[in-house]
Structure formats: structure tokens, C-alpha cells
Amino acid sequence: MAADGQCSLPASWRPVTLTHVEYPAGDLSGHLLAYLSLSPVFVIVGFVTLIIFKRELHTISFLGGLALNEGVNWLIKNVIQEPRPCGGPHTAVGTKYGMPSSHSQFMWFFSVYSFLFLYLRMHQTNNARFLDLLWRHVLSLGLLAVAFLVSYSRVYLLYHTWSQVLYGGIAGGLMAIAWFIFTQEVLTPLFPRIAAWPVSEFFLIRDTSLIPNVLWFEYTVTRAEARNRQRKLGTKLQ
């Protein structure tokens, strides 16, 4: 516990703006949109978790593209220096500039890149063609819907204007297309060599770029290995 003398010391307190979102009191829609605007944080946590457990080079490259996208957003904001709407009613923001919206740029980069990955990178490997296309369509529509709602939330909560989220979305989409092409044409041919590095082998970093459908591959390999071990276990018990 803090000593009594510490409580009287003057201090300048600042919030952690990464997860600090304000909404109008008593506004249910604003409350829900405030949580929705935290989607970039959830995406980053998901990426870190996926990298820790999967350690796949394409996933690491995807996260690197998101980081580069954020750097470009910061650069554009500080070059244009367009203020946020309504004189900046929110004091706890990372920067006073709003053009382009970093939330919008982040989510549209994530959604557009994922869209390209689903339809251009992943290919059919089994006979369930209809179900494969169905889940891709549903997932793609869901990603685009979330990107739109996050962009809308920034306008609704007065963090950005429509033009700021629009240009953020355009910038994020263009960055996603450019990074996807760069990954496919430049980085992917290097992945087998990178995966063979001693440091990559030490950290169990792998390359699955030559596997058309990683989900189906992992499912079949895991099922085959489980059956093989089950047969061995049954033989030992006899």
C-alpha cells in the first residue's frame, strides 16, 4: 500500500491510450461500438498467440506487414497534421492528429490481406468444394463487416471524421495489396532458406508456403498420427 506521504505528492497522470475508449454515457450503441473499436488490440493478441504456438513464417510476415502499416500511418499523420473532429473532445488519445484513422487503416489492412490470402493463397485439397467456398465467403464477409463497423465506430465516437476513416481504409487496403504481392513474390521464395537457418530450427520456426491448405493438412496428419499411436498402444496392451 502507498504511504500517506505519497498520496499528497503532486503528479501528472496519463492513461494507457491503447485500450482507452470513451463513449457517451447511457448510449448502448456507443458502448458496443467502443468495445468493437478495440478490435485491433484483439487482432494483435491473436497474432502473438498464433506465432507462439504455430511459429509459421507467413504469419510472422503478416504481423510484420501490420507493423509497417502502423508506421506508415504514423508518418502520414505527422505530415498532414489534420486535427480530430469537434476540437478534440477526447483528451486521452495517442496523437492529436486524425488523418488518416489508424484504426480504420489497421482493420482494412487486416481484412483485405486476409481476403487475398483466403482466395489466392489457400487452395482446395479435398472434395468438399462447396463447404470450402462457403466458409471462405462467410469469413470474408465477416472480416469486411468488422472493418466497416470499426471504421464507423471511430466516426460515431467522434474520434475521426468520415474522410479520415475513408482515407485510412484506402491506405490500409492499398498497403495490404502491396504487402501481399511483396510477400508472395519476394519473401515466400526465401522462406525455405529462412526456415533452414540454425536459429529458425532452434525456435521451431516453420515454412508452410508449399502446403495449399494448412488446416486440412494439419487435420489429416494429426488424425493419421493419432491412429498410428493408438494401434501401437493396442499392440502393447495385448
From Swiss-Prot:
GO biological process, one term: dolichyl diphosphate biosynthetic process
Membrane topology (UniProt): Multi-pass membrane protein
Cellular compartments annotated: Endoplasmic reticulum membrane
Record field: catalytic activity: a di-trans,poly-cis-dolichyl diphosphate + H2O = a di-trans,poly-cis-dolichyl phosphate + phosphate + H(+)
Top-level taxon in the UniProt lineage: Eukaryota
SMART domains: acidPPc (SM00014)
Pfam family, one: PAP2
InterPro entries, A to Z: Dolichyldiphosphatase_PAP2, P_Acid_Pase_2/haloperoxi_sf, P_Acid_Pase_2/haloperoxidase
Protein's name according to its UniProt entry: Dolichyldiphosphatase 1
